[in-house]
């Protein structure tokens, strides 16, 4: 078994790496937009941005390959550590009940499940991140086309149009494209893929172990802030064979995307033997779902609702940091004085906005008792240089 906290943060190190990739892509696009000039000659400007478009795809693919190589070993170790942790917890329960379970490393079946889960997750990551090369081209084309349209309309100066284009690509960030056509931000897709992959793989290993040892009952973990559909069965006992008096696998949606072990699910299970003490009482489970979190406006909410609000604050902070990083990159690659002044003004504006957003999040966390999650606020291209500049601008 893995705890909800372990599953919640298992993808953090992988996301850190892919966040660096996202910022590298955003900076690359911002730099290319800045290098194309200010549209004094539309024909020349179009030729320049088409030339940049031609090299953008290959450069993004090179960046993806670089980060994929770095994440492969990290992901392998993550799966191995998760598998060992999950089976050691379960095996202690089996031993306490007179059984002799196999450790992960000596069980061919468990190792095969671990390897299959790792390869599936790694394959999904590779396929998804490769689509960022195409999506980056789309972002670049859309931003340049909109800039040209704005400038040609006469309602915007060329400098304003290009500054807006740089802001647009930063706000969009890097995104992946699924076969269905659905789009997701890169960090969102990575977190979902890794968390789901780890959860499903350790769940399958625990299930295989239970079946081999003849254990029919499993207790499901519980945590505050569970989505409402999962709160209905968390902390309960499930029968693998469908015994009466217990939840069945279909009751918990096992094998479905929005059920137990589905997308982003932080629940796990572990062996339970009739007559053993339960980890969660009915009262304790009720308290996990209570509306006992007070917002600054005095309204009461569940922890799930409060955490969703916290995630919204964090997304806004990351977007602002990406915009500052993109402005910083463009400022380092410009010679047009008017555009420089415009981007300097934008940098000052977003520096103040960042300070305000961080203050709002800190106040919200302090009032609700939630802990700030710095890993969800960080935009990894927003390094020391733009951070120091933002602070300096804010203190002027």
Regions found by a protein language model. Name each.
Residues 16, 116, 173-176, 244, ...:
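Intrinsically disordered, low-complexity segments enriched in small/polar residues
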Residues 123-213:
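Contiguous, non-catalytic segments that form substrate-binding/exosite surfaces or channel walls
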Residues 34, 40, 170, 178, ...:
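Generic detector of intrinsically disordered, low-complexity, polar/charged segments
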């Amino acid at each position: 078994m893995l705890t909800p906290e372990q599953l919640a943060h298992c993808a953090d190190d992988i996301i850190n790496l892919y966040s660096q990739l996202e910022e590298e892509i955003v900076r690359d696009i911002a730099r290319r937009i800045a290098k194309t000039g200010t549209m004094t000659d539309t024909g020349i400007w179009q030729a320049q941005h088409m030339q940049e478009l031609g090299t953008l795809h290959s450069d993004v693919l090179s960046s993806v390959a670089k980060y994929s190589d770095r994440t492969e070993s990290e992901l392998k170790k993550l799966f191995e550590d998760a598998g060992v942790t999950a089976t050691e917890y379960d095996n202690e329960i089996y031993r306490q009940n007179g059984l002799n379970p196999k450790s992960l490393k000596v069980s061919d079946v468990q190792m095969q499940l671990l390897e299959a889960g790792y390869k599936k997750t790694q394959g999904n990551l590779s396929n998804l991140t490769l689509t960022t090369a195409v999506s980056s081209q789309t972002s670049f084309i859309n931003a340049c086309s909109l800039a040209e349209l704005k400038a040609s309309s006469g309602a915007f100066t060329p400098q304003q149009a290009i500054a807006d284009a740089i802001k647009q690509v930063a706000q969009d960030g890097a995104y992946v494209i699924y076969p269905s056509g659905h789009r997701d931000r890169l960090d969102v897709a990575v977190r979902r893929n890794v968390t789901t992959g780890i959860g499903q793989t350790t769940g399958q290993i625990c299930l295989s172990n239970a079946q081999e040892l003849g254990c029919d009952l499993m207790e499901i973990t519980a945590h505050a802030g569970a989505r409402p559909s999962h709160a209905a069965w968390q902390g309960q006992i499930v029968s693998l064979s469908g015994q009466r008096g217990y939840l069945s696998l279909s009751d918990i949606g096992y094998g479905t995307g929005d059920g137990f072990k589905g997308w982003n699910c932080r629940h796990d299970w572990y062996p339970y033997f009739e007559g053993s003490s339960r980890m969660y009482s009915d009262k304790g489970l009720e308290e996990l779902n209570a509306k006992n979190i007070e917002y600054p406006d005095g309204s009461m909410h569940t922890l799930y609702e409060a955490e969703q609000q916290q995630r919204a604050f964090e997304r806004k902070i990351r977007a602002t940091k990406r915009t500052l990083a993109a402005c910083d990159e463009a400022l380092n690659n410009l010679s047009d004085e008017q555009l420089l002044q415009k981007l300097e003004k934008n940098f000052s504006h977003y520096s103040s906005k960042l300070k305000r957003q961080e203050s709002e999040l800190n106040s919200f966390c302090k009032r609700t008792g939630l802990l700030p999650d710095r890993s969800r606020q960080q935009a990894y291209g927003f390094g020391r240089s733009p951070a120091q500049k933002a602070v300096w601008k804010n203190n002027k």
